[in-house]
């Protein structure tokens, strides 16, 4: 069995393709998970979709077949040709897939290194897949260890000190443009996660915020929590607000652009639009009166922040490497320990059966049963001593899975029996 990760990020895929791949609703996530699980080679899977990445994580019995199937599913979903997806994708297998996910969870692969949103996004992605019966114990273990690794990085480095996200970078860019945001009014379109973060950063910077949203759901509570500097209005007044104010942030989950040239009225003042949505919310051309910043155009500012965190990132990568090795050792241990327990159980069952036969045929007195059982137990314990020691050493061998497969064949151990006998494995 293998772990496989196929990754499309800001590093290898521009926003025009990423927005086609984005799974920005539960319906779309459910659709792609159903497609992925239609292959017998995909045992478990989950999808992680954020403004900067789309990743498919799979647990598979055949990496090549799974890889081809995943790319075909993404083509069916997005309309992007298979060849282009293969060319753009970063593909990680086995230990590489583990290391990559741990780096992602630790925010080392993020556009903004050190941002803390990604752990929550990873947990939510797993929960959705698990609730929809697409993920099980194998991806669960991997995500659990990934979150443990992220916690270590957070606690043992200062990489998340003064954490920043795409939203905060956009606000910082606005502050750079205007000099100060104190008492300035900014319009935030959308009350989702990114919009909420943008509003919080704006208010922290001294700005007043008007949140434009399609419905009152969530936004009323959000405005109340944000305090006196926040208010909200209906999306029906979108045209009015984007022509009245000069600082606009947009982060909705709309499948198409909501701000286009048809809505723009000529104004004497210069307007600054920050599009932090994927797919993009804004379809405008930069002019002498309009400047548009997308997720990708914020990259230069983000990279300056990355340079400041480089030293901490090196320490964090060391932790990711250690955590990867720990997880791989856990996987190998999880091969040997169930095998040991199952072989011992089979020996015990066989010994008990032969003892009962001896009693029935009169070869052994019932009064001697207890002593005979002890003797048999000592015999198979002595016989299995060396195999047990050697099996425990499997964890240090690169070909552990192949050796384990041979042992299962010799002892006629089926995978389902192995799982049933070893659901609660104690240390041996």
UniProtKB/Swiss-Prot annotation:
InterPro entries membership: 4pyrrol_synth_GluRdtase (IPR000343), 4pyrrol_synth_GluRdtase_dimer (IPR015896), 4pyrrol_synth_GluRdtase_N (IPR015895), GluRdtase_CS (IPR018214), GluRdtase_dimer_dom_sf (IPR036453), GluRdtase_N_sf (IPR036343), NAD(P)-bd_dom_sf (IPR036291), Prot_inh_cystat_CS (IPR018073)
Catalytic machinery residues: 51
Binding-site list for NADP(+): 190-195
Keywords: NADP, Oxidoreductase, Porphyrin biosynthesis
Domain of life: Bacteria
Pfam family name, one: GlutR_N
Pathway the protein acts in: Porphyrin-containing compound metabolism; protoporphyrin-IX biosynthesis; 5-aminolevulinate from L-glutamyl-tRNA(Glu): step 1/2
GO molecular function: glutamyl-tRNA reductase activity; NADP binding
Enzyme Commission number: 1.2.1.70
Sequence positions that bind substrate: 50-53, 110, 115-117, 121
Site residues, Important for activity: 100
Reactions catalysed according to its record: (S)-4-amino-5-oxopentanoate + tRNA(Glu) + NADP(+) = L-glutamyl-tRNA(Glu) + NADPH + H(+)
Gene Ontology terms: biological process: protoporphyrinogen IX biosynthetic process from glutamate
Comment text on domains: Possesses an unusual extended V-shaped dimeric structure with each monomer consisting of three distinct domains arranged along a curved 'spinal' alpha-helix. The N-terminal catalytic domain specifically recognizes the glutamate moiety of the substrate. The second domain is the NADPH-binding domain, and the third C-terminal domain is responsible for dimerization.
Similarity comment: Belongs to the glutamyl-tRNA reductase family.
Subunit structure: Homodimer.
Job description of the protein: Catalyzes the NADPH-dependent reduction of glutamyl-tRNA(Glu) to glutamate 1-semialdehyde (GSA).
Miscellaneous remark of the record: During catalysis, the active site Cys acts as a nucleophile attacking the alpha-carbonyl group of tRNA-bound glutamate with the formation of a thioester intermediate between enzyme and glutamate, and the concomitant release of tRNA(Glu). The thioester intermediate is finally reduced by direct hydride transfer from NADPH, to form the product GSA.
Protein name, UniProt field: Glutamyl-tRNA reductase
């Amino acid at each position: 069995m293998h772990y496989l990760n196929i990754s499309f990020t800001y590093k290898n895929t521009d926003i025009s393709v990423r927005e086609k791949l984005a799974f920005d609703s539960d319906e779309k996530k459910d659709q792609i998970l159903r497609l992925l699980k239609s292959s017998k080679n995909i045992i478990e899977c989950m999808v992680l979709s954020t403004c900067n990445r789309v990743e498919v994580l799979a647990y598979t019995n055949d990496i090549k077949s799974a890889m081809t199937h995943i790319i075909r599913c993404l083509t069916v979903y997005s309309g992007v040709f298979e060849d282009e997806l293969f060319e753009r994708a970063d593909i990680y297998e086995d230990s590489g897939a583990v290391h990559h996910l741990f780096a992602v969870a630790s925010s080392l692969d993020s556009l903004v290194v050190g941002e803390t949103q990604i752990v929550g996004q990873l947990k939510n992605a797993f929960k959705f897949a698990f609730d929809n019966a697409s993920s099980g114990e194998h991806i669960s273990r991997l995500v659990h260890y990934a979150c443990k690794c992220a916690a270590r990085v957070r606690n043992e480095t200062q990489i998340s000190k003064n954490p920043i996200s795409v939203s905060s970078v956009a606000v910082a860019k606005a502050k750079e443009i205007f000099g100060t945001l104190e008492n300035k009014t900014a319009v935030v379109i959308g009350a989702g996660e990114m919009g909420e973060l943008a509003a919080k950063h704006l208010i922290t910077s001294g700005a007043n915020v008007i949140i434009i949203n399609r419905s009152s759901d969530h936004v009323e509570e959000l405005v109340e929590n944000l305090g006196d500097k926040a208010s909200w209005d209906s999306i029906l007044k979108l045209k009015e607000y984007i022509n009245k104010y000069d600082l606009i942030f947009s982060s909705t989950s709309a499948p198409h652009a909501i701000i286009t040239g048809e809505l723009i009225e000529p104004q004497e003042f210069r307007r600054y639009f920050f599009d932090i949505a994927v797919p993009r919310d804004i379809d405008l051309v930069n002019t002498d009166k309009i400047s548009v910043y997308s997720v990708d155009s914020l990259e230069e500012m983000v990279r300056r922040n990355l340079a400041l965190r480089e030293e901490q990132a090196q320490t964090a990568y060391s932790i990711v490497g250690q955590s990867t090795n720990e997880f791989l050792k856990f996987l190998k241990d999880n091969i040997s320990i169930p095998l040991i327990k199952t072989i011992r159980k089979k020996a015990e069952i066989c010994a008990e059966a032969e003892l009962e036969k001896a009693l029935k045929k009169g070869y052994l007195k019932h009064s001697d049963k207890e002593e005979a059982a002890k003797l048999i137990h000592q015999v198979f314990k002595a016989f299995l001593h060396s195999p047990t020691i050697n099996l425990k050493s499997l964890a240090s061998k690169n070909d552990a899975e192949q050796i384990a497969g041979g042992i299962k064949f010799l002892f006629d151990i089926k995978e389902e029996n192995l799982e049933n006998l070893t659901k609660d494995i104690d240390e041996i």
